[in-house]
């Protein structure tokens, strides 16, 4: 099981809002946010996980979203949030996506976060595809192809719902970070591989991607309230890259730490939606 930390001190626990969770094995869960109003300092059970599963994403929702799950093998499913019934904190959830052998979910996005999906592969290629190209399906399906995986592209490592005025940061396993404008990328169809976004040295891959606000603070980091200097950005990228390397060998994070990070991301996403 995982534990939730009290990271919603700056927001009210509003009736009708939920925490929507996704795991790498395609399990999704929706719990009323009010269930987390009294989180103990030692944490609070948030979801029950199978031994070989882990939580990858948490979003704050209003029960009116379309949910997008994307896998490392380039599959995507879109379904209504209302297809998932609300459950208590300690429940395991339900099947959101039926995965093929070896595949796993690498990201979850909500319709309100953007009008296109920016998908990036481990070898530095990426593309934007309008969310209108993804038809709504029933929860639990296999989804549709959203990226053409080849030896040149490698597997998918990140997905973000974006608008044309957004920027993204790409972070490599060597701690290199670049910033790209979504407007500089071409809109492409679902079954394509995209274009090169970053030049990588041999044995270097993209570790993660992050969406950037106009004030240049990462929306994925709820504690970042001031602009980062170039030196601080490089240091942050190096830390993220080192963490990515460790995670590829073994799961070094505790459940408490992982849940805290994911809930912080959910808070940041919720704050952004309210600002808009």
PLM segments and residue spans:
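Short, small-residue-biased leader/transition segments that mark boundaries at the very start
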Residues: 1-8
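Repeat-based blade/solenoid architectures
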Residues: 5, 53, 91-93, 100-104, ...
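N-terminal cationic and glycine-rich segments that engage phosphates or anionic surfaces
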Residues: 13-15, 43, 84, 91-93
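A structural feature that tracks compact, well-ordered secondary-structure segments
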Residues: 18-36, 47, 58-61, 66-84, ...
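Beta-propeller and closely related beta-pinwheel folds
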Residues: 38-60, 90, 98-100
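Acidic/polar low-complexity surface segments
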Residues: 42-46, 92-97, 140-149
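Generic long, charged, amphipathic alpha-helical segments
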Residues: 138-162
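Acidic, low-complexity intrinsically disordered tails
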Residues: 210-276
């Amino acid at each position: 099981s995982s534990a939730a930390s009290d990271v919603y001190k700056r927001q009210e626990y509003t009736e009708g809002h939920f925490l929507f969770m996704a795991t790498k094995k395609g399990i999704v869960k929706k719990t009323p946010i009010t269930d987390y109003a009294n989180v103990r300092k030692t944490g609070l059970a948030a979801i029950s996980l199978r031994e070989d599963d882990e939580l990858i994403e948490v979003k704050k929702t209003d029960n009116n979203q379309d949910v997008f799950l994307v896998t490392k093998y380039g599959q995507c499913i879109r379904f209504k949030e209302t297809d998932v019934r609300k459950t208590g904190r300690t429940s395991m959830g339900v099947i959101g996506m039926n995965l093929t052998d070896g595949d796993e979910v690498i990201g979850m996005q909500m319709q309100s976060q953007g009008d296109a999906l920016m998908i990036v592969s481990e070898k530095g290629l990426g593309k934007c595809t309008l969310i209108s190209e993804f038809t709504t399906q029933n929860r639990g399906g296999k989804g549709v192809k959203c990226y053409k995986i080849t030896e040149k592209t490698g597997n998918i490592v990140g997905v973000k719902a974006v608008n044309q005025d957004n920027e993204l940061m790409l972070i490599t396993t060597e701690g290199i970070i670049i910033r790209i404008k979504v407007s500089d990328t071409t809109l492409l169809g679902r079954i394509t591989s995209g274009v090169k976004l970053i030049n990588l040295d041999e044995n270097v891959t993209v570790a993660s991607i992050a969406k950037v606000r106009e004030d240049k603070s990462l929306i994925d980091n709820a504690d970042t309230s001031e602009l980062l200097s170039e030196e601080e950005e490089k240091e942050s990228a190096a830390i993220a890259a080192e963490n990515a390397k460790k995670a590829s060998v073994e799961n070094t994070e505790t459940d408490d730490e992982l849940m805290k990070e994911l809930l912080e991301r959910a808070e940041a996403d919720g704050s952004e939606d309210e600002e808009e």
